[in-house]
């Protein structure tokens, strides 16, 4: 299993890493939330850019990114515009989505970008290559806030991300039952044991899926999302509680 190192953080070794999402809508809130987040116990800062109101002004977006970089210089920064179709706050064209991610890559301010698998194969491949040429890692993602597909389909999506040279494939699915959570965990384990040559991130959402956010080290998920303040997805738990449980499982 190949690990991914961002700054001094080795993803894919040891206990799952904790990612927190910052979802401020303007520069003033980016600044105040960044200061509040600075004291929290987490590993990776995800900036959910789809919550930022002034998206059309690239300078404003990058000014906000600069604040995050300067406030928490030691934390890996993951730049994420979550599309409306995958649970995000805003809908933008594919062209605008790619341009925004390329601007983030060009800025030199971000360590990783999130790229949605179903953006379009050619655009995804080109953007991965562009990111890698600028030493930016790619978390390739897929989210379904309605259902959990069969294990074979989950594995197929993760393998497709891997074939597109994602540094970290990621999938988040909504369970309709406890057995859906088992499906996600089964797929994670099979992917990790049989196909993955890099870290993967998987989760089953909502209260039903909470176990998947805690048991990554057992089944093969390299990171998990926690909440500093407001959860960015159903089922997230506080970073302090999360770290406690991850440490217990790691040391057992």
UniProtKB/Swiss-Prot annotation:
Pfam families: DHquinase_I. 3-dehydroquinate binds at residues 21, 46-48, 82, 213, 232, 236. NCBIfam families: aroD. InterPro entries: 3-dehydroquinate_DH_AS, Aldolase_TIM, DHquinase_I, Type-I_3-dehydroquinase. Belongs to the type-I 3-dehydroquinase family. Involved in the third step of the chorismate pathway, which leads to the biosynthesis of aromatic amino acids. Catalyzes the cis-dehydration of 3-dehydroquinate (DHQ) and introduces the first double bond of the aromatic ring to yield 3-dehydroshikimate. It comes from Shigella sonnei (strain Ss046). This is 3-dehydroquinate dehydratase. One of its GO terms (molecular function) is 3-dehydroquinate dehydratase activity. Pathway: Metabolic intermediate biosynthesis; chorismate biosynthesis; chorismate from D-erythrose 4-phosphate and phosphoenolpyruvate: step 3/7. The keyword Ribonucleoprotein does not apply. It catalyses: 3-dehydroquinate = 3-dehydroshikimate + H2O. Its EC number is 4.2.1.10. GO terms for biological process: 3,4-dihydroxybenzoate biosynthetic process; amino acid biosynthetic process; aromatic amino acid family biosynthetic process; chorismate biosynthetic process. Homodimer.
């Amino acid at each position: 299993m190949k690990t991914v190192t961002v700054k001094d953080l080795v993803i894919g070794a040891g206990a799952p890493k904790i990612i927190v999402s910052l979802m401020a809508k303007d520069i003033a809130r980016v600044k105040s939330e960044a200061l509040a987040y600075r004291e929290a116990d987490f590993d990776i800062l995800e900036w959910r850019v789809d919550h930022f109101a002034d998206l059309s002004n690239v300078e404003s977006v990058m000014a906000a990114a600069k604040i995050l970089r300067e406030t928490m210089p030691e934390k890996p920064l993951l730049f994420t515009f979550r599309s409306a179709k995958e649970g995000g706050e805003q809908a933008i064209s594919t062209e605008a989505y790619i341009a925004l991610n390329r601007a983030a890559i060009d800025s030199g301010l971000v360590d990783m970008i999130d790229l949605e698998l179903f953006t379009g194969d050619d655009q995804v491949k080109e953007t991965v290559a562009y990111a890698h040429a600028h030493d930016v890692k790619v978390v390739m993602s897929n989210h379904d806030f309605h259902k959990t597909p069969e294990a074979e389909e989950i594995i197929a999506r993760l393998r497709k991300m891997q074939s597109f040279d994602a540094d970290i494939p990621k999938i988040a699915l909504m369970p309709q039952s406890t057995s859906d959570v088992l499906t996600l965990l089964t797929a994670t384990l099979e992917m990790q044991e049989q196909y993955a040559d890099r870290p993967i991130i998987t989760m089953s959402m909502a209260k039903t899926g909470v176990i998947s956010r805690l048991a990554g080290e057992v089944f093969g998920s390299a990171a998990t999302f926690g909440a500093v303040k407001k959860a960015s997805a159903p089922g997230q738990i506080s970073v302090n509680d999360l770290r406690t449980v991850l440490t217990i499982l790691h040391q057992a």
